[in-house]
Amino acid sequence: MEDFVRQCFNPMIVELAEKAMKEYGEDPKIETNKFAAICTHLEVCFMYSDFHFIDERGESIIVESGDPNALLKHRFEIIEGRDRTMAWTVVNSICNTTGVEKPKFLPDLYDYKENRFIEIGVTRREVHIYYLEKANKIKSEKTHIHIFSFTGEEMATKADYTLDEESRARIKTRLFTIRQEMASRGLWDSFRQSERGEETIEERFEITGTMRRLADQSLPPNFSSLENFRAYVDGFEPNGCIEGKLSQMSKEVNARIDPFLRTTPRPLRLPEGPPCSQRSKFLLMDALKLSIEDPSHEGEGIPLYDAIKCMKTFFGWKEPNIVKPHERGINPNYLLAWKQVLAELQDIENEDKIPKTKNMKKTSQLKWALGENMAPEKLDFEDCKNVSDLKQYDSDEPEQRSLASWVQSEFNKACELTESSWIELDEIGEDVAPIEHIASMRRNYFTAEVSHCRATEYIMKGVYINTALLNASCAAMDDFQLIPMISKCRTKEGRRKTNLYGFIIKGRSHLRNDTDVVNFVSMEFSLTDPRLEPHKWEKYCVLEIGDMLLRTAIGQVLRPMFLYVRTNGTSKIKMKWGMEMRRCLLQSLQQIESMIEAESSVKEKDMTKEFFENKSETWPIGESPKGVEEGSIGKVCRTLLAKSVFNSLYASPQLEGFSAESRKLLLIVQALRDNLEPGTFDLGGLYEAIEECLINDPWVLLNASWFNSFLTHALK
């Protein structure tokens, strides 16, 4: 289409159209239909005015060639095609000299013979529909409207066609030719369907009563009334320089706009320091499950019953010992806590009837691990406001940490497929409305791509743990309740499976506010030796608790089984969000949908089936030091899901800040790639805002490192 436009229209028209699009931040290379429409409209405006003059007697005449010395004045003033400032200047000057009412919107022409502005319309739809839209938009009796269509129809205000038959026939013939040329190149259908209706701007409605008083109270200083403020705002030229706008606003502001070039941006500075450590609420790639297939035991579905059944599948328990102590904790207490869990589970089995929940004895090791009686005593402010040296605790700045390789490994693992399916087809939720076939189809394709993904396992594990912990926090506030960490899935053959990852012991939980903290101790099974990456496990005390027989390619091997124990905490609001982790599925489905939509609008048909079934096509997944990584559509689905899940698992103020601030830099870089010549002021301040979020959070550090890869490749 772009080539067609450049061949078909006069270069001056093409240049004007490009300028107009650039003024509104649109790209002629991308919005090619719009490009063609603007050129067509410009050409019709020029043809409308061509050869029409007013002679000395004030009569309208048509002169195609003739005496260059004749005293002729152009009958039409062309307003369309000028830049906005110039166009309004022309309109204002016409209004001042002729006394015609000033139009609300920029018209296309002024007719000196009839003394009226003219709005020209060129439509690919029905002329009367377009005429009504135009009339509705400009709502002015004074501006004359004249609409042409590509099928040779026309419509004008009061059927007054302004021009003679022959001049109008020239315009209609030209439009018909453009249509045929487009059709012969297969461009017409797309062009015809891409026409949008006129955007009508809401009429100003009168504000009265309370709203009026509130409006008057909330004006910026120095404005006496709402009208006076509106007039000021309307006086801003939409494309004046930013510097000008700023200087109008305040005498103190002085901004110098610096051009943003390919050489301008520098990489983000990542912090230095010891490598960052794992901070998720439960183990991810390092978790180990004890599982039962086709569970049918008595009390199946009751977490404690399921947990005991899973524990019984393992026979390699041994006397536990500490292999990686916690730097600052009392490590023997962690060891005693695990022994206590084993002993109390044994006690349950010796009882006649297994209880549905288990509250642990409040031993000294658990009291220590759960921070019992550790909180400083709270005093009423009235009682202590007279204390002379009352002060807030000094809190240390968080220690800076560097990015460690384990974070990328965790992410890669989250994108992988597992042997089991973690969600049923309807997990994303049926739509309430009688959903069209397409949406269900998309959902089913997407579910098929992600149901076996490890990120989906993390979702279900997170939902289970948070739900169980929130329930126990409300139901057993004072008890140290033992909560098994469980998930359910289906094997390749479709058999049900229940998995136990370990246990949580919850501390006292009188949670009044959303942010009140409940402490818990987590104990999770793993085959990962903590001594390989000790920095990752800084917050854990790790015990060796057994040996597991594993089937490998070379036969059976005996591997030590570890227990990762740590004290942790969460709050009502965090548990509420944890329970809603299934939203990650929805978020990534919507991202995939927008990709399908983009593809479908180019091809002008629904591309869902081709999108998911064309296995040969690859899609961009992300940036790495090697360049843009590509993969199958399934890989894209799983990567988007993993990102969404990690945003939930590693949610933090650092992530919020980094996402918001880095997005600004991203948009500037994208504008540069789209040749929009962006300018910036205080780029240093933006870098500062981004980098103050890079402290010690593993997920934020990984995202920053990805951002740097993106910068490198985007600016090549």
Swiss-Prot record:
Motif Nuclear localization signal 1 (NLS1) in this chain: 124-139
Motif (Nuclear localization signal 2 (NLS2)): 184-247
Protein location: Host cytoplasm; Host nucleus
Cofactor: how bound: Binds 2 manganese ions per subunit.
Entry's Gene Ontology BP terms: cap snatching; DNA-templated transcription; symbiont-mediated suppression of host gene expression; symbiont-mediated suppression of host mRNA transcription via inhibition of RNA polymerase II activity; viral RNA genome replication; viral translational frameshifting
Post-translational modification summary for this protein: Phosphorylated on serines and threonines by host kinases, including human casein kinase II.
Cellular component terms (Gene Ontology): host cell cytoplasm; host cell nucleus
List of residues binding Mn(2+) 2: 80, 108
GO molecular function: endonuclease activity; metal ion binding; RNA binding
Enzyme class: hydrolase
Major place of residence: host cell
Signal peptide extent: none
Keyword match Cell membrane: no
Entry cofactors: Mn(2+)
Positions that bind Mn(2+) 1: 41, 108, 119-120
Keyword terms: Cap snatching, Endonuclease, Eukaryotic host gene expression shutoff by virus, Eukaryotic host transcription shutoff by virus, Host cytoplasm, Host gene expression shutoff by virus, Host nucleus, Host-virus interaction, Hydrolase, Inhibition of host RNA polymerase II by virus, Manganese, Metal-binding, Nuclease, Phosphoprotein
EC id: 3.1.-.-
One family name in Pfam for this protein: Flu_PA
General function of this protein: Plays an essential role in viral RNA transcription and replication by forming the heterotrimeric polymerase complex together with PB1 and PB2 subunits. The complex transcribes viral mRNAs by using a unique mechanism called cap-snatching. It consists in the hijacking and cleavage of host capped pre-mRNAs. These short capped RNAs are then used as primers for viral mRNAs. The PB2 subunit is responsible for the binding of the 5' cap of cellular pre-mRNAs which are subsequently cleaved after 10-13 nucleotides by the PA subunit that carries the endonuclease activity.
Description of how the protein assembles with itself and partners: Influenza RNA polymerase is composed of three subunits: PB1, PB2 and PA. Interacts (via C-terminus) with PB1 (via N-terminus).
HAMAP family: INFV_PA (MF_04063)
Family under the similarity heading: Belongs to the influenza viruses PA family.
Name of the protein in question: Polymerase acidic protein
High-level lineage: Viruses, Riboviria, Orthornavirae, Negarnaviricota, Polyploviricotina
